[in-house]
Amino acid sequence: AAGALDKIISFVNTTEQPPVERLLIPDMALTAAEYFAVEKNEKVLVLLTDMTLYADALSIVSNRMDQIPSKDSMPGSLYSDLAKIYEKAVQLPEGGSITIIAVTTLNDGDITHAIPDNTGYITEGQLFLRADPDSGKVIIDPFRSLSRLKQLVQGKQTRKDHSQVMNASVRLYADAQNAKTKLENGFDLSDYDLRCLDYAKAYATRILAIDVNIKIDEML
């Protein structure tokens, strides 16, 4: 957007720089965010990418300090190290706020790895992105994405039937995945199975794909 660059502050650490410096980046960014949120009553958005590189830097530094590694060679302090960052998100009574959106890249697609596993326990929700072979797009996976705050919005700031529409949509998408499994295992598909597969492709293309940009009411 025009004029957006005047409102952006960037803190950058490249792979050529020492890992210990990478550990300072989130704190530096959040310190700047706190200034604008607290002192200026601004609504601040903090984008942190990539937190996997941050956690890897934690692992490198802790190993050099001869600390005993935990799961996946991560330091035992990984949970608290991530929590002190994500818990800086706040809504202040005076009107200022800090919203944090962090990117965590999975190691070999492993969602059980210590980094995404700990992240999932701390954050108020996550959008799980994956490539969808049927639509050929990168989509938000409805089965692995979640929001712990959706009840504050659904049916209150959106349509009354938001929850029902969402649950029905995801259920049909799940039925499509079951139909796909039947097809892969050589079973015959019913008319309902075929319609679910058609629905899943349309759902992924028109709703779940990350290049879709429509309003919630239109989506519903």
What are these regions, as identified by a protein language model?
Residues 1-35, 64-75:
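Nucleotide-state-sensitive switch-loop elements of NTP-binding domains
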Residues 6-9, 39-45, 95-101:
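Loop/turn-to-beta-strand initiation segments
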Residues 9-12, 45-46, 126-131:
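Short hydrophobic alpha-helical runs that function as membrane-insertion/retention elements
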Residues 13-15, 50, 103-104:
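Fold-independent oxyanion-binding glycine-rich loops
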Residues 20-58:
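Phosphate-binding/switch loop-helix module in NTP-utilizing enzymes
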Residues 35, 53, 60-220:
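Conserved catalytic/coupling modules of large nucleotide/cofactor-utilizing molecular machines
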